[in-house]
């Protein structure tokens, strides 16, 4: 059975890109536009890993990460941002990895592979 990844990003083209690229790697990918009902969605969908944008229009990804950690402490989370200014904060908020958003998903795929080992 394929590992399930939840991609949370407010930009539709990013969600689509990540979903297509990660599906090609053998993962089952589900997406969310933001943090509304995110904890309930995680409870229902039971993803193996979350890829979480930090800067979203209606939600702060760092706050969402804390909420995820409080309820699903062992769920791997990779933070993504177009800015590298959050890299130092990542350690203090307990994200598993931090990657800079890019159309080349090599780094993201590597980090996902490290956390999930094999895609299927």
Regions found by a protein language model. Give the residues of each.
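Short amphipathic alpha-helix used as the core "switch/output" element in two-component signaling
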Residues: 40, 62-72
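Acidic catalytic/metal-coordinating carboxylates
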Residues: 33-34, 60-63
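Active-site residues of response regulator receiver
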Residues: 53
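C-terminal output helix
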Residues: 103-114
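The feature encodes the CheY-like receiver
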Residues: 15, 57
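Short hydrophobic/Thr-rich beta-strand motif most characteristic of the beta2 strand and flanking loop
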Residues: 26-33, 41
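Charged docking surfaces used in two-component/phosphorelay signaling
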Residues: 16-24
């Amino acid at each position: 059975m394929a590992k399930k990844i939840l991609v949370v990003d407010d930009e539709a083209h990013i969600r689509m890109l990540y979903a297509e690229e990660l599906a090609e790697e053998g993962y089952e990918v589900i997406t969310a536009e933001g943090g509304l009902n995110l904890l309930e969605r995680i409870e229902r969908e039971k993803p193996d890993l979350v890829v979480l944008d930090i800067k979203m229009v209606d939600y702060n990804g760092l706050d969402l990460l804390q909420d995820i950690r409080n309820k699903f402490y062992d769920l791997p989370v990779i933070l993504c941002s177009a800015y590298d200014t959050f890299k130092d904060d990542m350690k203090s908020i307990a994200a598993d990895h931090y990657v800079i958003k890019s159309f080349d998903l090599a780094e993201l795929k590597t980090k996902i592979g490290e956390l999930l080992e094999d895609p299927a």
